[in-house]
Structure formats: structure tokens, C-alpha cells
Design a protein with these regions (language model features):
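Preference for the N-terminal adenyl/adenosyl cofactor-binding alpha/beta module
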Residues: 4-166
Length: 166
């Protein structure tokens, strides 16, 4: 496999090239800051702090679940790709996904969606996002969330309630 041979070559000839551009901590901090900014914008547009915190945790959970393989076929990234092209569709598309995630026999189109219990997806409630916000979320979704510290969930929930928290 050419890619593996290339990595092996770099291990001996250019090991610096194999170092991640950001540490796990730096990546987690960057993501937390981006979502804190989103939280502030959503609260300023009149959404209640608990609804903002819950919504942001849903988004982050979807990204994490996708990258560890429990949300199939890049389903959330595909949703974001469609919503970036048509921002007014985001609420409908995300509500469909959230509904499927709370259903033991959930589907989005022809895609089977695993059931996620625990309360995060008890409702299909979602919040509207602008095209710019959707592009930022899509950029975040393209990161490898398996490299991000899972403790970010608690941090983002707290920031959704009070964005001034660090």
C-alpha cells in the first residue's frame, strides 16, 4: 500500500512531518472556543440558555458519533453539506436526524440510524442556523472528533448556559 510505505519513509527521513499539526488539547480548545461563539450568537438571537446548551451538545455528539463509527456513512456531514447549500433546510433536516436517533427503528432516507437513548435526543427540537454558522459547523465536523477530548461535552453544556465560563 503506497500510503503506508510513504508514512514509513517519513518515519526515517522526515519524522517532523508525521507530528500532528495540533495537540489533542489545542484541537479541543479550538473547537470549544468556536462552539462558545456559536452559543453566544444563539443566545443573543433570543434562544433560552438550556435550549442552546442542549442543541450544541447534540451537534457535538453527532460529530463525535460519526467519527468513532456509531453514526453511519458520514450522515451528519452529508446533512451539513446539504444545509450549507440551502440553509433554510437545516431545521427540517436536523429534526429528521434527531427523530431517527431517538427511534429504535430510525431511518433517514434509506440510511438506518442507531438508537441513542439517554435523553439527548428525546425531542426533535433544533435551532435555526445561518449559512455562515453552518459553514463553521461543517468545518468542525470535518475534524477528526475521535482526537478531541470527550470532556468537551460538559464544557460546552456549561458554556451554552453561560458563555462567559472558561
Amino acid at each position: 500500500e503506497p500510503e503506508k510505505r510513504e508514512w514509513l519513509k517519513f518515519a526515517f527521513t522526515d519524522p517532523e512531518r508525521l507530528k500532528p499539526s495540533q495537540t489533542r488539547q489545542q484541537l479541543t480548545e479550538q473547537v470549544a472556543e468556536n462552539f462558545a461563539e456559536l452559543s453566544i450568537r444563539l443566545r443573543k438571537s433570543g434562544h433560552a440558555p438550556p435550549a442552546v446548551a442542549h442543541f450544541i451538545n447534540r451537534l457535538v455528539f453527532c460529530m463525535f458519533a460519526e467519527d468513532i463509527g456509531i453514526l453511519p456513512n458520514r450522515l451528519f456531514l452529508k446533512l451539513l453539506d446539504a444545509a450549507v447549500k440551502s440553509p433554510e433546510s437545516f431545521e427540517h433536516l436536523s429534526a429528521q436526524l434527531f427523530t431517527a436517533m431517538r427511534d429504535k427503528n430510525g431511518f433517514v432516507g434509506f440510511e438506518r440510524v442507531p438508537w441513542f437513548n439517554g435523553g439527548l435526543f428525546d425531542s426533535a427540537e433544533t435551532l435555526p442556523l445561518s449559512g455562515t454558522e453552518l459553514k463553521r459547523i461543517r468545518a468542525a465536523a470535518k475534524l477528526d472528533w475521535s482526537d478531541i477530548d470527550p470532556s468537551i461535552f460538559g464544557t460546552l453544556f456549561e458554556r451554552g448556559l453561560d458563555p462567559e465560563k472558561r
